[in-house]
Swiss-Prot record:
InterPro entries: HORMA_dom, HORMA_dom_sf, HORMA_MeioticProgression. Coiled coil: none annotated. It comes from Homo sapiens. Keywords: Chromosome, Differentiation, Meiosis, Nucleus, Oogenesis, Phosphoprotein, Spermatogenesis. Residues 253-394 are annotated as: Disordered. Gene3D superfamilies: HORMA domain. The gene is HORMAD1. It holds the Pfam family HORMA. The keyword Glycoprotein does not apply. This is HORMA domain-containing protein 1. Residues 24-226 form the HORMA domain. A motif (Nuclear localization signal) lies at residues 383-386.
Length: 394
């Protein structure tokens, strides 16, 4: 019987460098991590349609990477933002990227969910925290450790996005870039960005802050954090989160300084990825069926010239475009396939969320909590720092 073996072409295969001995190799890795993180988040949160992604392989993990697509202007715009991030990253100006989701096109400062990607530049080669907190300091690290940390971070993002409650049907995206002011020229702006007007944002509902993870090389440190509404965490599997949780006080402001990450006002819900991965290893068949495709490639962002074989199932098309009364409004389904039951009253009317009640009480009392991405708790008045926002929103 004739058999055929599927070969991964060099263009479709993505591998980490065998070793990270130069700053350029480290930069390529960090770019890949940023690309696959953003792609994973936007794909699993259902922000763009299936056609906006192409398929790539991260070792044995099939992943999706965001690409320019003439039929999806939003994905094309986000690709341009990413290229602007790369420009600032290469110049060592970029300190943090904030990708925020909001629901009112007229009010991009009121957000519903956001993702923070933080960057540090170093020549000391710090070790990665995911192995052990008691490790001795070394001047270099094994590339296998970097590779393991990178895959671990991607899997953490995947599992968190898979288990979060769904976003509203219609959402918009914006991005804010923060810099190291001491080295960034005052007039510098990456391609596609302009000087920002409002440093802080208003967060809808009660925020939950999550430290997803980090990857370190001898030249860079890359961290990922997520802020979402607590209501989206209600149905999350308790085994996914680390048992060492700190309760979030209502409407606490996140002071996003590394030195404050261990303070009480910052919720540190670390993802317990090992437990989830062990469950998947015990049941590999179900894991293979449930794990969606995520991705990255050599230059991180695929171009619209490529035409990978993508298939869109009927259920996915319905999820993206069918908004008729025939839809069952008692439940919603994420792209990962997980079904969430909507809260209903009297069998047919949705229950008003506590988020809506909180927003109403805030407006009635005149209290609006400002969420500062970039300020110190020791500053009575947050210092005005340079940051950028897109010339065009999605």
């Amino acid at each position: 019987m004739a058999t055929a073996q599927l070969q991964r072409t060099p263009m479709s295969a993505l591998v980490f460098p065998n070793k990270i001995s130069t700053e350029h190799q480290s930069l390529v890795l960090v770019k890949r991590l940023l690309a696959v993180s953003v792609s994973c988040i936007t794909y699993l949160r259902g922000i763009f349609p299936e056609c906006a992604y192409g398929t790539r392989y991260l070792d044995d993990l099939c992943v999706k990477i965001l690409r320019e697509d003439k039929n999806c202007p939003g994905s094309t715009q986000l690709v341009k933002w990413m290229l602007g991030c790369y420009d600032a990253l290469q110049k060592k100006y970029l300190r943090m990227v904030v990708l925020a989701v909001y629901t009112n096109p007229e009010d991009p400062q009121t957000i519903s969910e956001c993702y923070q990607f933080k960057f540090k530049y170093t020549n000391n080669g710090p070790l990665m925290d995911f192995i052990s907190k008691n490790q001795s300091n070394e001047s270099s690290m094994l590339s296998t450790d970097t590779k393991k940390a990178s895959i671990l971070l991607i899997r953490k993002i995947y599992i968190l996005m898979q288990n979060l409650g769904p976003l509203p049907n219609d959402v918009c995206l914006t991005m804010k870039l923060f810099y190291y002011d001491e080295v960034t020229p005052p007039d510098y702006q990456p391609p596609g960005f302009k000087d920002g007007d409002c440093e802080g944002v208003i967060f809808e509902g009660e925020p939950m802050y999550l430290n997803v993870g980090e990857v370190s090389t001898p030249f860079h440190i890359f961290k990922v954090k997520v802020t979402t509404e607590r209501e989206r965490m209600e149905n999350i599997d308790s085994t996914i989160l680390s048992p060492k949780q700190i309760k979030t006080p209502f409407q606490k402001i996140l002071r996003d300084k590394d030195v404050e990450d261990e303070q009480e006002h910052y919720t540190s819900d670390d993802l317990d990825i090992e437990t989830k991965m062990e469950e998947q290893e015990k049941n590999p068949a179900s894991s293979e069926l449930e794990e969606p495709s995520l991705v990255c490639e050599e230059d991180e962002i695929m171009r619209s010239k490529e035409s990978p074989d993508l298939s869109i199932s009927h259920s996915q098309v319905e999820q993206l475009v069918n908004k008729t009364s025939e839809l069952d409004m008692s439940e919603s389904k994420t792209r990962s396939g997980k079904v969430f039951q909507n809260k209903m009253a009297n069998g047919n009317q949705p229950v008003k969320s506590s988020k809506e009640n909180r927003k109403r009480s805030q407006h009635e009392s005149g209290r609006i909590v400002l969420h500062h991405f970039d300020s110190s708790s020791q500053e009575s008045v947050p210092k005005r720092r340079k940051f950028s926002e897109p010339k065009e929103h999605i």
